[in-house]
Amino acid sequence: MNQTIIKVSVFLFFIMFIYSGFGKITSFKKKTLGLSKKTGFPYPINELGMIGVILLEIIGSIIIVSYFLDKERTQKYITKEYIRYICLLLLAFMIVVTPLYHPPHKQIIAFLSNVTTFAGLLLIYNMI
């Protein structure tokens, strides 16, 4: 496999998660209120969940991208198991979020977009 193509592909793939994480920061209250309405959980619980998702999307993505951009240097600090764990957390997040925010009977294109993102995460998990 061409390593340059892999590096560029992983970088481009995770831009979406990083952008989404920063979007949640800039509209934190609005996003958290929307989540509270969808889940029915109290607002403080949704705040904690939103903070966790923001950290996962931004920091988790940066860690994975760093790993793929310079494996030799980052393998001293970040193990393959750690990268797999982050991928599994993102996969679990996608499983929960996709039907909640994009029910297929109402938003088939957004739903399929998330399914495709899920497939991309599986490929990245498999490349580690």
Residue ranges and their predicted role:
Residues 1-30, 43-59, 63-128:
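Extended, low-polarity transmembrane helix blocks
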Residues 34-43:
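Interfacial loop at the N-terminal end of multi-pass membrane proteins
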